[in-house]
A protein has these predicted regions:
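Hot-dog-fold acyl-thioester-processing enzymes
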Residues: 2-89
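Hydrophobic beta-sheet segments that form the core/acyl-binding groove
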Residues: 88-126
């Protein structure tokens, strides 16, 4: 979705009435490189060695460095706003820690609209 503004194209946002319970969000795949994992940890000011030092990550019981939860949260926000548009406001994100994301993994997100009430749309990600 987009609208033309002069010669530029501006993304448009979904409206409440555009969204129905059961609507599926398009999947998003993010290849996770060592550089991405380190850069996003630094960008979120998470200097824990398990996010940038492979030998110390192994010493602490991990097979390699792994992505921090703040980076995961940021990618979730990007996923939702890429779908809903620039006018969307994320009111709440609830993430459960599961399997870590390591270099070479692909982070795949998908989701669906699970509820609508009083102008608020709820989306569950998988």
């Amino acid at each position: 979705m987009s609208e033309h503004v002069g010669e530029r194209t501006r993304p448009t946002s979904l409206r409440y009435d555009d969204v129905q319970i059961g609507d599926e969000l398009p999947p998003l795949e993010i290849p996770l490189t060592r550089t991405l994992i380190v850069a996003t940890a630094i960008a979120s000011r998470d200097y824990q060695d398990v996010h940038h030092d492979p030998s110390l990550a192994v010493e602490r019981g991990s097979p390699d460095i792994f992505m921090n939860i703040l980076s995961t949260n940021g990618f979730v926000g990007r996923y939702i706003t890429d779908w809903a548009g620039p006018d969307a406001t994320i009111r709440k994100v609830a993430i459960r820690l599961g399997a870590p994301n390591y270099p070479g993994d692909t982070m795949t997100m998908s989701g669906s609209v699970t509820a609508k009430e009083d102008g608020v749309v709820e989306v569950a990600l998988r």
